[in-house]
Amino acid sequence: MASRESIVTSISPDLTPLVEFSRQFLSGGKRFRALFCYWGWRSVCAPDSPLSPVVGAASALEIFHAAALVHDDIIDNSDTRRGAPSAHRLFDGLHARSGWAGDDTEFGRASAILLGDLMLGWSDELLDDALLEATDAAGARQARIEFNRMRTEVTAGQYLDILEERAWVTQPDSELLDRAHRVIVYKSAKYSVLAPLVIGAALAGATAEQLGSLREFGLPLGIAFQLRDDVLGVFGDAAVTGKPSGDDLREGKRTVLIALARDHGSAETRTLIDELLGNPDLTESQIVRLQSAIQASGAVDRVETLIADNVAEARRVLASAPLHADAVAELGALTDTVTRRSF
């Protein structure tokens, strides 16, 4: 950010908010993607491997993630992120305070789109710098391939997510659970866990067998990670999640949790979900009604079982993976961290 600030502000001091707001979005978060990238690298690297390539790759993932969150909040009309105003709200607040012409909201959304685009570019520049420092040229090429695939898949997954919020009415009920699971795989599981692991390992020159083990470990763990996030999106404490409780209900997320509630709940539960889910003006009492109906359907217990099954599969793969023992231990600890986050 320090190196890019001089480029941006040399164009005009009016661009200072782009840097300030970028810093704000990069200063928080749990750094899960960076951690998985680092431990993927550590799981296969030689003891004397230079650290700078993986630091650059992990940082590129964090900046990419920040950009994705900026765009995601625009898509979902989310007012907050990590307990603070989302990027488009920061910009529309700037517009309002400055007394400029036009609509605050329109300015905020347009500016945040550009901020996200800017950070996407910075992420790619940072990855390029990291790959140039890698000692294994073939591994660097593989890391770039994995990063490119991740960008395509997560964008596709994001489209599938917004599609499901609208297209579910035309789909057979029997297909909704599978469609919700597909969103999990591409919007989150591969992007949040599998890809960072493989990018880090590829950078260190991992063998095909090692990359295969990390994929087999990362996919079920990523699914469990997102299933936990879906539960938090409905029942989570705002102080823990940084988002208002029930935010996914207002946004109309057609998650595995919701699909299971519709499949196993009463007719009244299904009607309640279909009538209220996706209403941005849900009252607190309506959110409580939805939460109670979802809980009564048994969907939460079923999701908890899915989380446990996926974690068990990830641990099974990790136990016999051809990876360094210290990294295996840390990846095991991370497995607990990303799937046992509290309400």
Positions of PLM-derived features:
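Short hairpin/turn module used for nucleic-acid contact or packing/dimerization
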Residues: 288-343
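Residue-level signal for inorganic ion chemistry
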Residues: 36, 123, 157, 258, ...
